[in-house]
A protein has these predicted regions:
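A structural signal for short, well-ordered beta-strand segments and their strand-loop junctions
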Residues: 1-2, 26-27, 70-72
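Generic structural signal for coil-to-beta-strand starts
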Residues: 23, 31, 67-68, 75
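Surface-exposed extracellular loop regions of Gram-negative outer-membrane beta-barrel proteins
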Residues: 25-50
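Beta-sheet repeat architectures centered on beta-propellers
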Residues: 52-67, 73-289
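Surface-exposed ligand/attachment interfaces on beta-rich extracellular proteins
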Residues: 7-11, 16-17, 53, 267-269
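A short beta-strand motif characteristic of beta-propeller blades
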Residues: 2-8, 45-50
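Beta-propeller and closely related beta-sheet repeat lectin domains
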Residues: 14-16, 22, 59, 108
Length: 289
């Protein structure tokens, strides 16, 4: 065993987080340093991989093995070896910057859900007065599909935790009635030694994300169905596994305000009847909880 003392290179502000693993990363407010074990007299080698960008707060950094995700003053990023890659450039960063309650940025927390390959940031939105320290939204990044989503949830903290061993004798601690447990006993959830996403809820109690599904809302990108021509839509067929409500949004010029249809319910044929004409279209689909 060996150790030493070294001064960090550069002037990147306070150290806010340090990640572990085969390679370590030291996050400062305006700098990221890679830490490699090399042994000998040097022991650890420190290399600056981001001289002008760091983490806003330590709790905005999360990790799944060698995949590191963090929120900086200019958006969301992922570390891949020596590369700091933007993952929220343009639309995601703009949305988060406009939706965040900037009076309480210190309450942003991040965690990884390795079971579902998600990097998640819990934050207070502009619609939340946040006087009690409770956040109300999660920004979610699937680092396999590279897709983003938003969830409305009230919590003060999120974190990843190990699932402990579960036996028939211990099930009474969870519930005295097995029929009231809403997680199938056949799922890998009950296997010990796996990491799962946990939270401190709005009542400041430890919780897990095992409840019933929330309402899902999807909106397609804006599309010109027939380039250079108008179109008329009379129905939409959502490919979903439940009943859904659809709103069609249209405009004739990109400078125009968006016009929305009334919400349409799915009929017995799986089609949502609508009647909307225009040049540019997008569909908003809501799937009930």
């Amino acid at each position: 065993k060996s150790s030493d003392t070294q001064d960090l290179p550069g002037s990147g502000g306070q150290v806010v987080a340090i990640t572990s693993g085969e390679v370590g990363y030291v996050f400062r407010q305006d700098q990221i340093i890679r830490m490699d074990f090399v042994g000998g007299a040097t022991i650890f080698r420190f290399s600056v991989i981001s001289p002008n960008r760091g983490a806003v707060f330590g709790q905005t950094v999360c990790q799944d093995n060698r995949q590191i995700f963090f929120y900086a003053s200019d958006g969301f990023f992922q570390i891949n070896g020596d590369q700091v890659l933007p993952i929220g450039a343009e639309k995601v960063n703009r949305f988060f910057d406009s939706d965040l309650n900037k009076a309480y940025t210190d309450r942003i927390t991040a965690a990884v859900d390795p079971f579902n390959t998600l990097a998640i940031w819990l934050y207070p939105s502009k619609d939340n007065p946040n006087t009690t320290g409770i956040c109300d939204k999660m920004l979610i990044y699937n680092y396999v599909t590279q897709k983003w989503s938003v969830a409305k949830i009230k919590a003060s903290q999120i974190f990843k935790q190990f699932v402990t061993i579960n036996t028939v004798e211990l099930m009474d601690i969870i519930s005295e009635n097995l029929d009231e447990i809403n997680i199938s006993l056949d799922t890998p959830y009950w296997t010990s030694g796996h990491l799962r996403l946990g939270a401190i809820d709005e009542n400041f109690k430890a919780a897990i994300f095992s409840g019933t599904n929330l309402e899902a809302e999807l909106e397609t990108k804006e599309t010109e169905l027939f380039p250079g021509a108008r179109a008329n839509i009379t129905g939409v067929r959502p490919i979903v596994d439940a009943s859904a409500n659809v709103v069609i949004k249209t405009r004739n010029k990109l400078a125009d305000a968006v016009t929305s249809s009334t919400s349409s319910s799915m009929n017995d044929s799986g089609i949502n009847p609508v009647r909307q004409s225009g040049r540019y279209f997008r569909a908003n689909v809501k799937i009930p909880a």
